[in-house]
Structure formats: structure tokens, C-alpha cells
A protein has these predicted regions:
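Post-cleavage N-terminal segment of exported redox proteins
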Residues: 1-31, 95-157
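Sequence/structural segment immediately N-terminal to covalent heme-attachment motifs in c-type
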Residues: 10-11, 15-16, 25, 29-55, ...
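Extracytoplasmic electron-transfer domains, predominantly the class I c-type cytochrome c fold
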Residues: 32, 67-117, 124, 131, ...
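Short acidic, glycine/proline-rich loop/turn micro-motifs
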Residues: 144-146, 180-183
């Protein structure tokens, strides 16, 4: 690493300001599976490195479920790592998604492909289920409700026409896709994310 990036002492200052090195402590009010999932997500899985918003020092703003910013989604390296809070899928589907990169109704893309290829496919099924149990326990924020009557009719018709031409052949006219083959667009994290960056890259 070239100078001045090879100088290490500034990292000590950064660590003292931003790093929480408190050891993981299991919660007595939660199940063994939940605690195992929490440990894997917060520690070795370091899911927050991509999915948690960053502060002024590029530090993760939160480290566990006690803060609503934890895993609330963040833009990183030209992709948007979607919020993992308030997920709308079953524990079994999420565990399969972590193991295979696709499930009955969803598929992963971008850097999450690398996570599956290099990491989560090698976890035991119990560990992937534990991660799923933990993530599904995290509450999401209230969805933004939009008044469909305020959308111009011409825009709706144009959107319908474009969807029918470019999307419906694979994803079906109702957006539900085909199980284990084509991901659903309904309740899709990438499609429904506030930030469209990943959707534009798929």
C-alpha cells in the first residue's frame, strides 16, 4: 500500500471514535436460533458493512437491532444494499435465498451474488435459518403510501404498455414471476427500494 495510505496510526484514532468492540452477548429473552442469527449477522457475516447507513467518517451508524438504522439500507460502490428490516418472506424462503441465491419468489444480484458464492452457501441450513429468524424479527419502517389518483392517467397507461412489452413475458402480467425460475416483482426488495440504483443495473 503506497504512502500515505500505509500509515497505520490514523486507524487507531478512527477505531477509538467509531468502532464498537463490545463482545456479543446473547439475549436471554430470545431463542437460541435468534441469538445464533444475531451473532452471525452482527459478527462474521458483517451484513451491516453494506446494508447499514454510513456516517461522516464512513462508519456504520448502528451495530445491532437496538438502533433502527441497523441494516436500514445503504448505497455502496454503485449498488444499493436494500434494507433488511421488515422483510416480507417466510423464514424458509429467506434461508433458501441465502443458501442458493434464489428462492421460490426472489433472486439476488450484484455483490450479494458474491456473498452467496463465497460465504452463505457454505453455512449449515440451521445457520441460514438462524440468520433468517433474526432478520425477520427486525421491524421495518412504515411504507410510504402514494395516492394513485394523483398519478396522471397517461403515465399509468404508458407504464402498463412498457411493462406488457418488456417485463410481462418473464415476470407475468401480475408481476408474480415463475417459482424458482423468474423472481417476482411484487414485494421485491430491489423493485420497491427507495433507491433505484440496483434496479437500474440489473
Amino acid at each position: 500500500i503506497p504512502w500515505p495510505l500505509s500509515i497505520r496510526w490514523p486507524l487507531g484514532i478512527w477505531n477509538s471514535l467509531f468502532v464498537d468492540d463490545t463482545p456479543f452477548t446473547p439475549r436471554a429473552d430470545k431463542s437460541a436460533a435468534w441469538n445464533r442469527g444475531a451473532y452471525l449477522v452482527q459478527g462474521p457475516g458483517h451484513c451491516g458493512a453494506c446494508h447499514t447507513p454510513r456516517g461522516v467518517g464512513m462508519q456504520e451508524k448502528a451495530f445491532d437491532e437496538r438502533d433502527e438504522q441497523f441494516l436500514a439500507g445503504e448505497e455502496l460502490n454503485g449498488w444499493y444494499a436494500a434494507s433488511l428490516r421488515g422483510l416480507k418472506m417466510s423464514e424458509a424462503d429467506l434461508a433458501v435465498l441465502l443458501r442458493d441465491g434464489r428462492s421460490k419468489h426472489a433472486a439476488l444480484s450484484g455483490p450479494m451474488d458474491e456473498v452467496v458464492t463465497n460465504s452463505t452457501q457454505y453455512l449449515t441450513d440451521d445457520d441460514n435459518r438462524a440468520i433468517a429468524a433474526y432478520l425477520l424479527s427486525l421491524p421495518g419502517s412504515e411504507p410510504v403510501k402514494r395516492d394513485a389518483s394523483k398519478v396522471a392517467k397517461a403515465e399509468m397507461e404508458n407504464g402498463h404498455r412498457l411493462y406488457a412489452r418488456y417485463c410481462a413475458t418473464c415476470h407475468a402480467s401480475n408481476g408474480e414471476g415463475a417459482e424458482y425460475a423468474v423472481p417476482a416483482l411484487k414485494d421485491n426488495l430491489t423493485v420497491n427500494a427507495d433507491n433505484p440504483l440496483t434496479l437500474l443495473r440489473v
